[in-house]
């Protein structure tokens, strides 16, 4: 089982990171293939709303923008399990969490039935 654990906190040793590292160790202890990612270590951008991923000529679930988040999104789509943690600042998750969710969700959302290209996942 492939599991990806993503820390969307800028603080690598505080509460969110501690909880995620505990989950990482737990998954690893039962034999999962686990990858841990700190979002604040990579260069990423949010969705630019260019709609290229919705073009009939574009392969589904491919975001046009290439940055450090692009290969991570591809690995997320191949994974069996995704665990993301973010602290809450001013009532909202961090900007890096939002950027990840915008890029991930928008490119897998089907305008045909407003469902996901990855039904059941």
Give each language-model segment a name.
Residues 18-21, 50-52, 96-100:
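Short, glycine/charged-enriched secondary-structure capping and boundary segments
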């Amino acid at each position: 089982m492939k599991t990806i654990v993503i820390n969307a906190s800028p603080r690598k040793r505080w509460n969110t990171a501690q909880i995620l590292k505990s989950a990482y160790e737990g998954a690893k202890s039962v034999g999962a293939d686990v990858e841990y990612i700190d979002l604040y270590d990579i260069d990423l951008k949010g969705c630019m709303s260019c709609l290229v991923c919705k073009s009939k000529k574009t392969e589904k679930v491919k975001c046009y923008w290439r940055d450090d988040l692009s290969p991570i999104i591809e690995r997320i789509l191949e994974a069996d399990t995704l665990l993301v943690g973010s602290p809450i600042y001013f009532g909202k998750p961090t900007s890096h969490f939002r950027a990840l969710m915008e890029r991930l969700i928008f490119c897998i959302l089907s305008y045909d039935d407003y469902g996901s290209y990855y039904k059941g996942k």
